[in-house]
Amino acid sequence: MTSSPSVENGGSGSSGSSALLGCMQQFKLFETQANFYMIGWNGSGVYRILKIDRLEASELNLREDSTAYTKKECYELLKRIHEGNKATGGLKLVTVCYGIIGFIKFLGPYYMLLITERREIGEICGHIVYEVSKSDMIALQHSSVLCNTANLRDENRYKRLLCMVDLTKDFFFSYSYNIMRSFQKNICDHESGGTLYKKMFVWNEFLTRGTRHHLRNTLWTVALVYGFFKQTILSEAGRNFKLTLIARRSRHNAGTRYLKRGINESGNVANDVETEQIVSEDVPVDRPMQISSVVQNRGSIPLFWSQETSRMKVKPDIVLSKRDLNYEATRVHFENLVERYGVPIIILNLIKTNERKPRESILRAEFANAIDFINKDLPEENRLRFLHWDLHKHFHSKTENVLALLGKVAACALMLTGFFYYQLTPAMKLEGYMSLSSSDADTSPHNSSDDDSRDYDSLEKNCRPSKNVANGDYDVKPSRLQSGVLRTNCIDCLDRTNVAQYAYGWAALGQQLHALGIRDAPTIELDDPLSSTLMGLYERMGDTLAYQYGGSAAHNKVFSERRGQWRAATQSQEFLRTLQRYYNNAYMDADKQDAINIFLGTFRPEQGSQAVWELRSDSHSNGRSGEISMGEDEKFLVKRCLSDGNILHESHTPMSAMSRKNESISHRGFVSSHQVTRTHIISESSPDMPAAGDVTLSRCTPSMPSTHFFGDVQKVQHNGSSSIYLSEQEDMSSVSNFVDIEWLSSSENLCENDHLSRPSALTIYSTAETSSSENIITEVKQLTPAMRESGSSSRKGKEPVETELSVHTKIRDDFPDSFKQWVAYGEALCH
């Protein structure tokens, strides 16, 4: 025997917590000609042995020794194994490792993926978080066993593809903390064992499935999360605190920029990322620790759309599918968000409104249609809240401070959702209150939908105030829960989205520090050093997520301008990033997508079947059925479909008189689309897109905003919400049902050193305390005389604006009769 187990460093990373002492964190892999032997040990000095068969390498055959050995007993056992295999070379040390990533099979034998080097990147409540520094792939089949050479070429190509998933970049894990879940869920909903591997943020769920099935535990594997993790220690008013920023990328509908767009039939969107911001006191282990977290979400626009990868176009045309007429997949997506985060779901949509050639604006109009259609079937308190806000337009307006405006939106969203606050006592930390248990049996069959989507109400009931576990003479503050989430998107959910997510994190940080008693005020000014530090973290996170999905760092024009960076240097940097993103999307993403599909088990190689590189089926798989390409030469008949329920549709039947859907409503108020008859759609987009010029869809007509029809209306009635607030500008760049646009736009001349505060002209009530969204926004008219006079000139001298629209609404007299007829009866407008 050339080596024997040694544990001089076996206790690395352990602490006094019983949970940390119980989990195995270091392993040694030995081999004979017939078997692999993996030895694992924990901080308590308990040794275990896993035996892996090598003779039948086409089948995964694992056996765990149920005996718990001491160090001496384990050494003696290995010595006997060595003596019994001397004739074939004995027992040899292969490698020291830190956990099994999983097992995978292509066309030949199984391979074992191991973590061979790790690096500590942070800790949460005493639980250490690591990133993968080095990994290795080892064939189970011994080299002396004959292999099938017919498939050797394809086998090697599959191995090269898998290696394209670089496990040393942005993969992190913890042995004792459920890093795949938010802090709130870890406190309130105690899940453990194999069920945690089925969560949507565990990227090696498929690779570990066989191990969990055979062993009924997760002692030997680690759950890898893909995304971003960064922790830093900061000081404020002489008190230290830890700021942790985590991004968890979903494994569902995962892939690259142009090959994964929109939504799939299961309601999973591309580029779905959960971002968590944790603030915790930096205190000794024997003192109670206050901790706060807030979660937000980003994800592709939940419609069936795609873009054709092109080597000739930097910005390919958008393809919008017509197959989901009742927005069933979109409804399922938002239903899943409600189950994961509770209500309200707040949508911040940042895509463009005005374009010479309609691209983003097509999706903006259709997304508005989908939200309105879904909201019709929801109880008032569960309806989707939204703000359509053209960030590109507002950024190029020299009178506006984009970060300050987004900060005001974030403050409004925070008042609706709240954030999580908890106080951990020393006993809870020492006993591993949030620990990951690896001994629970994983006996349930695999279900791809078995994700972190439990009913939020049950989670809330399970979360007990920390006073129930308090001990000693400590004053324990009451806990807080976050209910609901802010969901942000642009087209790629990278550049503009990251700016908005920083604004939300900035607004939340002040609230979190105030809750911890570190700051007296719940706000932080933009020029505060804390804001700059936080901006650096979000900028780094944005670059990381952009590399993963888009192939280059993020476009950070807003951040660069905020830092006062030389504009010419910024433009040069942005141009280079555009070229890098274009090259990767056009030339590299196909292989990268194949690699991701193999790693996640989306594609499984089989002998006699087509290879993954022969299919290339991911290209626009979300938009094949019934897709309509937005080419320049195609022209469509434009219909005007307004959102008012009394406007007639093509059959001349008032929509309000049509038979309503089934009254049965699910526990969250979401109704399945097969129970619904689609009655109307809304449309809003760029006013400068001609009806017979640029192409559009009849379902998402780029038409004039409602202010063109009914004068300068600021508040209109929708079927999906009690009140919709529009911008005074005629480009419809801002539309919302939870933020008053007039109040928001009153900040156009906001000074950069203005800070977030609870707006005096805005009162937001919790969704649990309101029965109508009318009550969400009040007192919005407390404006200065100058602001009242700053509206459009056409508004002066007119009658007071009505807040509800109906067929009796007076249409402006300067429109021709044919146009009035079209508005009143919903017919197609032809020239």
UniProtKB/Swiss-Prot annotation:
Expression by tissue: Ubiquitous with a higher level of expression in young seedlings than in other tissues.
Keyword presence, S-adenosyl-L-methionine: no
Gene Ontology molecular function terms on file: phosphatidylinositol-3,5-bisphosphate 5-phosphatase activity
Cofactor: Mg(2+)
Bias (Basic and acidic residues): 448-463, 796-805
Chief place where the protein resides: membrane
Catalytic activity as recorded in UniProt: a 1,2-diacyl-sn-glycero-3-phospho-(1D-myo-inositol-3,5-bisphosphate) + H2O = a 1,2-diacyl-sn-glycero-3-phospho-(1D-myo-inositol-3-phosphate) + phosphate
Record-linked Pfam families: Syja_N
Stretches the record annotates as Disordered: 439-475, 785-805
Quaternary structure and partners: Component of the PI(3,5)P2 regulatory complex at least composed of ATG18, SAC/FIG4, FAB1 and VAC14.
Record-given protein name: Phosphoinositide phosphatase SAC4
Organism: Arabidopsis thaliana (Mouse-ear cress)
